[in-house]
Amino acid sequence: MTVLPALPPLDDLETLNVHLETLSAENRVCWALQHAPDHPALSSSFGAQSAVMLHLLTRFAPDIPVILVDTGYLFPETYRFADTLTERLKLNLKVYQPLRSGTWTEARHGRLWEQGIDGINQYNTLHKVEPMRRALEELQVGTWFTGLRRGQSSTRTQTSIVQRRDERYKISPIVDWTDRDIWEYMKHHDLPYHPLWEQGYVSIGDIHTTRPLEPDMREEDTRFFGFKRECGIHENI
């Protein structure tokens, strides 16, 4: 692993982020693995371009836990894609599910995703946020790697490379990457896009709240019927 020159300490996030902006994604990962808190983990939706972060992290930390929140409503293609990448990259996959099944949730609350923004928020809390929070706590994650990028939506344009949430640090090594950067990395390393990419799906979540991109649509409008882009994981954890 590359040994990097001294950077500002973690308690000076503003200055640290300025320095990290000058480093490559690979060196940002190396820095975090050397200097951020113990018990790192990577979360992945196994979405359209997820192979990039999975490949990047496992180059330097082959056994890093990879957290997948299985909401119970993922596309069949997503489950198969997760199997494919897990086998190819020898991932240390940790699958977390909601405390109650989708059938149970529907029996109690109906189809929450059809109940406007309040229903969508409640669904996301039960099926996404709670399992992710539980995963981070059970795995005692001190450093949480994500594949967030500023260009993905208007809600992510100000995302920093390093953020602090209580005692946990969230690291987004490719936050400044463009779609072109993603494509070049995937081409160079012969990595696959999600199978639904070729059908126009650019952001892939649950079956009932994901749409393919259509003319005059923003990428963020393909999720949650255009009500919102974020599922709550990166807003609330």
Swiss-Prot record:
Its EC number is 1.8.4.8. Pathway: Sulfur metabolism; hydrogen sulfide biosynthesis; sulfite from sulfate: step 3/3. Keywords: Cytoplasm, Oxidoreductase. GO terms for cellular component: cytoplasm. It catalyses: [thioredoxin]-disulfide + sulfite + adenosine 3',5'-bisphosphate + 2 H(+) = [thioredoxin]-dithiol + 3'-phosphoadenylyl sulfate. InterPro entries: PAPS/APS_Rdtase (IPR004511), PAPS_reduct_dom (IPR002500), PAPS_reductase_CysH (IPR011800), Rossmann-like_a/b/a_fold (IPR014729). SUPFAM superfamilies: Adenine nucleotide alpha hydrolases-like. It is found in: Cytoplasm. The active site is at residue 231. GO terms for molecular function: phosphoadenylyl-sulfate reductase (thioredoxin) activity. The keyword Cytoplasm applies. One of its GO terms (biological process) is hydrogen sulfide biosynthetic process. Belongs to the PAPS reductase family. CysH subfamily. PANTHER family: PHOSPHOADENOSINE PHOSPHOSULFATE REDUCTASE. NCBIfam families: cysH, PAPS_reductase, PRK02090.1. Catalyzes the formation of sulfite from phosphoadenosine 5'-phosphosulfate (PAPS) using thioredoxin as an electron donor. This is Phosphoadenosine 5'-phosphosulfate reductase. It comes from Xylella fastidiosa (strain M12). The gene is cysH.
